[in-house]
Amino acid sequence: MIYFDNAATTLKKPDGVAQAVSDAIMNLGNAGRGAYDASLHSMRMAYETRELLNELFNGEGPEQIAFMSNATEALNTAINGMIQPGDHVVTTVMEHNSVLRPLYLKEQTGVALTVLPLDENGLISSEAFEEAIRPDTEAVVCTHASNVTGTALNLYRIGEACKRHGLHFIVDASQSAGILPIDMQAMNIDAVSYTHLRAHETLMNL
């Protein structure tokens, strides 16, 4: 079979993924539920994974890493936790429904929303984000890269603008994590989400 949809969901997983799933089913206990060996081993593995992810994204510490069922839940949690009625949010037309739908729902409850369009080259400049910021802006929510246009946003520049204006910066890295560098501290990112579905060796072998 010739598979052309890797940009949506990676088809072939590394052999280590299948082995890890098998090992987990056969050997791991319930993390946090007991002091027996299998449970303690599960807890250690979870924490070690947090350490690896924190190192990959240069986060503020492994205790800040949260495991959720998918990127949609992670993005919804960040959006619902950081954005309240009366706030203004800047986002883009490049976003996945996991960003746009909760933001449109927030709009119905009193959140003001600015959706930045693409230019003729399929890009959105960092200046466009800066120009969209208002006195009541609370957050910028954007993707890092699009698997539709193949373009990536300059998170450094957008993050600098967020820092200057004291804004929350929420990033959907589902298309870029493990492929493009992401430095949460240097980019002033408050929350970043990713999914393993589109990752190859980099994230699947953590």
Regions found by a protein language model. Give the residues of each.
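Pyridoxal 5′-phosphate
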Residues: 1-201
